[in-house]
Design a protein with these regions (language model features):
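Surface-exposed, charge/polar-rich loops and edge strands
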Residues: 2-41, 45-177
Length: 177
């Protein structure tokens, strides 16, 4: 069995409320084992014999659509992959942003195309800066995300694909499992 983390987009925001015990039950219905949730923002840890993330993502998305009645984009990583993300220093070239008060990690299903990366990077404004590494992007802000003029919707428009974000503290907690 392999341990995975499902990062669900837009759970418990915008009126899409799902209690964590219900979410765990939905994952158990799919045959996943040792299902746990971490904070009420769509982070689900589970074990499965499946070896590839893409079919797991599709299975979860189909089941959640069937049971909840709306699309839930799902991004699957292993705890080891998340630990590798946490070990990166994407802003090492910037003294200010290397020590920024807010660092978020965004997840997409496949590495963005070069033009998408360029569009994302162009959102940077000195206060908010971006870096892309594989299937993740990093958003460093000298303020809090709530004070930023950049939105998740603007990021998705730049990337032209759905994504979900977590703060680095949450990613560290998910990687420690």
């Amino acid at each position: 069995m392999t341990r995975y983390v499902a990062l669900l987009r837009a759970i418990n925001v915008g009126g899409r409320t799902v209690k964590m015990d219900r979410l765990r039950a939905l994952f158990e219905e799919m045959g996943f084992r040792k299902v746990e949730t971490l904070i009420a923002s769509g982070n689900v840890l589970f074990d499965t014999a499946a070896r590839s993330a893409a079919p797991i993502e599709k299975k979860i998305e189909a089941h959640l659509f069937k049971t909840l009645g709306y699309d839930v984009e799902t991004f699957v990583r292993t705890p080891a992959e998340l630990a590798a993300v946490c070990a990166l220093q994407p802003f090492a070239d910037s003294v200010e942003h290397a020590k920024a008060s807010a660092l978020y990690v965004g997840f997409v299903k496949a590495p963005p195309a070069k033009d998408a990366c360029a569009r994302l990077m162009s959102l940077g404004n000195g206060i908010d800066e971006f870096r892309v590494h594989g299937r993740e992007y990093f958003w460093s802000s000298l303020k809090s995300m709530g004070q930023s003029k950049i939105t998740g919707a603007a990021i998705e428009r730049a990337l032209k694909v759905p994504s979900t974000m977590r703060n680095i503290t949450t990613v560290r907690r998910l990687s420690a499992d």
